[in-house]
UniProtKB/Swiss-Prot annotation:
SMART domains attached to this UniProt entry: TOPRIM
Pfam families with a match to the protein in the record: RecR_C, RecR_HhH, RecR_ZnF, Toprim_4
Protein name: Recombination protein RecR
Keyword DNA repair recorded: yes
Gene: recR
Keywords: DNA damage, DNA recombination, DNA repair, Metal-binding, Zinc, Zinc-finger
GO biological process: DNA recombination; DNA repair
Native source species: Dehalococcoides mccartyi (strain ATCC BAA-2266 / KCTC 15142 / 195)
């Protein structure tokens, strides 16, 4: 990783710049701007931010049903009994749920795998939440599983694997429509493209 420290800057500031620079999407210049902004910001604002970041590690866990992020036993979506219980949308990461919920065209439940099958990285079906998904399908309530893994090599491999497991159960398996460019992560797709991909999902 590129060194973001500044020789002419105090050690504590350099430490903050270095820490911010380790965040995804934050380059050296952005890290420096954020660090100097935080130095000028009111103390209350900085302390609130610090407490919020700390609470994420101390209070946030995973929903026991879908493995979305949650601050109690169940995430807000799984607590909502008005959603369509016959549909489960399978995603790779919790942030994919945020993208789909923002579009507002899907009213079923979710299942977060926390990854995708990737032999090159040593990630197999046993390393992600596939067994838990199959257990959820045993209650007979679900009649459609929507595979919303990313349109990447790993996402496609995971979707194919899941389809082979789920289809023999007599459950309809669909995949988001091909409007999403290959290699794109779901969380970065625009609302219109994502909406069309969900509404135009196809048998898989």
């Amino acid at each position: 990783m590129k060194d973001t420290s500044l020789p002419s800057t105090a050690g504590a500031v350099n430490k903050l710049i270095d820490s911010l620079g380790k965040l995804p999407g934050i380059g050296p210049k952005s890290a420096q701007r954020l660090a100097f902004y935080l130095m000028r910001a009111p103390e209350e604002q900085v302390l609130t931010l610090s407490d919020t970041i700390r609470s994420i590690k101390n209070q946030i866990s995973q929903c026991r049903i879908c493995f979305n992020v949650a601050d109690s036993e169940l995430c807000p979506i799984c607590q909502n009994t008005k959603r369509e219980a016959n549909k489960i949308c399978v995603v790779e990461q919790p942030q994919d749920i945020l993208a789909l919920e923002h579009v507002g065209v899907y009213r079923g439940y979710y299942h977060v795998l926390h990854g995708a099958i990737s032999p090159t990285e040593g990630i197999t079906s046993q390393n992600i939440r596939i067994n838990e998904l199959m257990s959820r399908l045993n209650d007979g309530q679900v009649d459609e599983v929507i595979l919303a893994t990313n349109p990447t090599t790993e996402g496609e491999a995971t979707a194919m694997y899941l389809s082979r497991l789920i289809t023999p159960l007599g459950i309809k398996v669909t995949r988001l429509a091909r409007g999403l460019p290959f290699g794109t992560e779901l969380e970065y797709a625009d609302d219109v493209t994502l909406s069309r991909a969900m509404e135009g999902r196809q048998n898989f």
